[in-house]
Structures are given as C-alpha cells and as structure tokens.
UniProtKB/Swiss-Prot annotation:
It is found in: Secreted. Residues 25-246 form the Peptidase S1 domain. Gene3D superfamilies: Trypsin-like serine proteases. The active site is at residues 64, 109, 201. This is Snake venom serine protease HS112. Residues 19-24 form a propeptide.
Length: 255
C-alpha cells in the first residue's frame, strides 16, 4: 500500500512506528469470496484503506484513513470485475474521537463512517457484528485486505488476501516498538512471514469469529520476525460506537 506521509513534526514518531495505511496481507492466500461480505474497500484516487461494515448504514475504519473525499465499495472481490451486487457509497458523516490527540496518529485510531445510503444484505454484502467479549491472548485471528502481498517492494493484488495470525500479550509489541498505545491489540506471527501490510490499514482483525481489531500500525518491512502489527481494540470503544449510532454525536471516546 501507499504509506501515509506524516507532516514534519511527526517524523520522530515515524522512526519508531511505521504506518500501514495501504498495506496488503503478506503470506496469505486469496480470500474465499464468501468470507468477507463485510469488508469495505476505501478509495480516494486509488485504493488506500479497508473498513468493516457493522450494520446496513455504518462502517468502522482507522482514523488515519480519513480523507476529504472517500468512495466506499461494498461487496467487492475482484477489483477489475465488479460483482453484480457490488455497491458504492460515500460518507454522510464521519466520526473521530473528539479527545484524540491530533498530532499522534496512533492515539485512538478509530473512525466511524455513516453511509449516505444504507446497503441491503445480499450474496456478497452483510455486516459483521461488534464483539460481545474482549479477545483472549493466544486467540487465532483472521486478517484480510487488498493490501500489498510483497514487502518491501509493493505488489497490489486484484483480489483480497486472507491469513491467520495470533493474538499476543501486549508486552511483545511494547518490546518491539518501545511502547504501545492504550486500547490496542498486538497480533502477528513471531517467526515472521505473515502480516498485514501497506493498504490493509483500517481493515478488521477477527478473532474466534468476532470483530476485535482495526489495523493501525506495524513494522516496515512487513512480516518481520518479532515485529507484530497493532490494532485498535474495538471492544474498548463499544460505548462510543453505540452512542454515536444511537444519535449522540458528541459522545466522547474512553480515556
């Protein structure tokens, strides 16, 4: 994926963290066409991020995926050949935590998008439910996206790729990156070789069938040994998400 370019006063932060806003899944295989009905393809002059449909009118992605104009594809599999039920939507409203530190991209990296028109369930479109419980360390988790399938040179696939990774104790990411933002999950494969990558940002981390994370950051090159990616922890933001959807547009994210 194309890496997000951060303004000059964030260059020091980039030495410690590498943003994966346009990354693909490394070490995965083509997703089954029926396993990603909730997966959104975010386009702004080119594919740059993923997202997750959580009901007929709302998509969750990463805050760093926000752009002025976004086209959202749902029901897509092969980029060059649209499905019959593929839909295009635009944001009607976008919500980012009002207490997010604007100069720290990793802080509260979550964005809720209200679509300009609801979508209907179809053969290739259906929402993914929000988690009912937090994930457990050791869980097997599914990653997916149209991000780069090679690293460091990037190769963008025509179809989404999927792979399985493991959920780690957050100390693994703290040791790898000299820190870890709050309300974050750490996931990957310790020996390397499987990972999200450029273009996968904003896409889901699905652990034991539940939508638990939103891809935020990871190492560059992707898929290095002992360099897991980290994901915004969806469960910790449930009160904010549910309040916004219920109409409380001034809801504040947890500290």
């Amino acid at each position: 994926m194309v890496l997000i370019r951060v303004i000059a006063n964030l260059l020091i932060l980039q030495l410690s963290y590498a943003q994966k806003s346009s990354e693909l899944v490394i070490g995965g295989d083509e997703c089954d066409i029926n396993e990603h009905r909730f997966l959104a393809f975010l386009y702004a002059g080119g594919y740059y991020c993923g997202g997750t449909l959580i009901n007929q009118e709302w998509v969750l992605s990463a805050a760093h995926c926000d752009k002025r104009i976004i086209r959202i594809y749902l029901g897509m599999h092969t980029r060059s050949v649209p499905n019959d039920d593929e839909e295009i939507r635009y944001p009607k409203e976008k919500f980012i935590c009002p207490n997010k530190k604007k100069n720290v991209i990793t802080h509260k990296d979550i964005m809720l998008i209200r679509l300009n028109r609801p979508v209907k369930n179809s053969e290739h479109i259906a929402p993914l439910s929000l988690p009912s419980n937090p994930p457990s360390v050791g869980s097997v988790c599914r990653i997916m996206g149209w991000g780069s399938i090679t690293t460091p040179d990037e190769t963008s696939p025509n179809v989404p790729h999927c792979a399985n990774i493991n959920l780690f104790n957050n100390t693994v990411c703290r040791e790898a990156y000299n820190g870890l933002p709050a309300k974050t999950l750490c996931a990957g494969v310790l020996q390397g070789g499987i990972d999200t990558c450029g273009g996968d940002s904003g896409g889901p981390l699905i652990c034991n069938g539940q939508f638990q994370g939103i891809l935020s950051w990871g190492g560059i090159p992707c898929a290095q040994p002992r360099k897991p990616a980290f994901y915004t922890k969806v469960f910790d933001y449930l009160p904010w998400i549910q309040s916004i959807i219920a109409g409380n547009k001034t809801a504040t994210c947890p500290p």
